[in-house]
Amino acid sequence: MSRQSFSLLKNLRSIASGSKIQTRSVTYMPRPGDGKPRPVTLIPGDGVGPLVTNAVQQVMEAMHAPVYFEPFEVHGDMKSLPEGLLESIKKNKVCLKGGLKTPVGGGVSSLNVNLRKELDLFASLVNCFNLPGLASRHENVDIVVIRENTEGEYAGLEHEVVPGVVESLKVITKFCSERIAKYAFEYAYLNNRKKVTAVHKANIMKLADGLFLESCQEVAKKYPSIAYNEIIVDNCCMQLVARPEQFDVMVTPNLYGNLVANTAAGIAGGTGVMPGGNVGAEYAVFEQGASAGNVGKDTTEEQKNANPVALLLSSAMMLRHLQFPSFADRLETAVKRVIAEGNCRTEDLGGNSTTQEVVDAVIANLD
């Protein structure tokens, strides 16, 4: 072996052992003026919503994030969205939202659904993944559920045909099916995801879910580098419980996505730690990813021990959406450190910490 080759081999061994590894920061080159603080519409919401949105505000202030909030009082039992709310979101383009209670039965429509329709937030995204240090039913879970947000069973087209007989219409359109499929594949492409799975019940609803599947199949042909498969929704739920690691990106019609996202969240670590958001062509609303329990119990509200992790991670997603990647990374890293250390957790994660104690721990772990 020549002296030059020996020297090269020695250097390679040194690098492999870590003695000469030099870290290089990832550079984000902003445009002039990108550091200007951005307004964000804030909906504290119901139940524990004010607790967890306040947690986000405290952390944002501690890290001097270039955002400020415009709060609006909104509650799920209101008959309509309050005046000025939509105008604020349309002006700011971004909203952070706590949970809103949806009354069961009666004549009050869901403000969550109304907000999505008014702003055409056609894609719901929930990221379900294992957090290091947090025990879960399965390992190696990293699933993104992308759900069509504006039609399907949530179209709200119900009426009583005759006394005792109610008809509820499920609406599936080519336009909405294609755009949610395009969004799912685009998301997979931009985030280096390897597979998109379409969830359906086309074996029974042959026309409605058949149209959804047909749209997914057409879009899949335009992304040959991304694997594509299909699964019936009942089998999907069973497979999620048995082998969730097989899933990557899942694209679903409206109702199925709600069920699948909450199931995946429960498997990966609980609804209290899963981030998410709703996005359209112009606007985005970020909130706790999985809807189950997002307004909390009365005792949780009274004891002030609501889990702020999901909304903090959703806020990191929001910061990336606003093109503040370093702030997003700092926030996400701090939250994950607190979870991994295990000393400060709320009751739903097996601890006895208050919301404020978790906030203080996250702030202490900020770089």
Curated annotation (Swiss-Prot):
Gene3D superfamilies linked to this entry: Isopropylmalate Dehydrogenase
Keyword Mitochondrion among UniProt keywords: yes
GO MF entries: isocitrate dehydrogenase (NAD+) activity; metal ion binding
Keywords: Magnesium, Manganese, Metal-binding, Mitochondrion, NAD, Oxidoreductase, Transit peptide, Tricarboxylic acid cycle
One Pfam family linked to the record: Iso_dh
SUPFAM superfamilies referenced in this protein's UniProt entry, alphabetically: Isocitrate/Isopropylmalate dehydrogenase-like (SSF53659)
Gene Ontology CC, one term: mitochondrion
GO biological process terms, semicolon-separated: tricarboxylic acid cycle
Ranges that cross the membrane: none
Cell compartment(s), UniProt: Mitochondrion
Main location: mitochondrion
Span of chain positions assigned to the transit peptide in the UniProt entry: 1-25
UniProt xrefs under InterPro entries: Isocitrate_DH_NAD (IPR004434), IsoPropMal-DH-like_dom (IPR024084)
Tissue: Ubiquitous. Predominantly expressed in roots, stems and leaves.
Family stated for the protein in its record: Belongs to the isocitrate and isopropylmalate dehydrogenases family.
Function text: Performs an essential role in the oxidative function of the citric acid cycle.
SUBUNIT field: Heterooligomer of catalytic and regulatory subunits.
Protein name per UniProt: Isocitrate dehydrogenase [NAD] regulatory subunit 2, mitochondrial
Organism (species): Arabidopsis thaliana (Mouse-ear cress)
Gene: IDH2
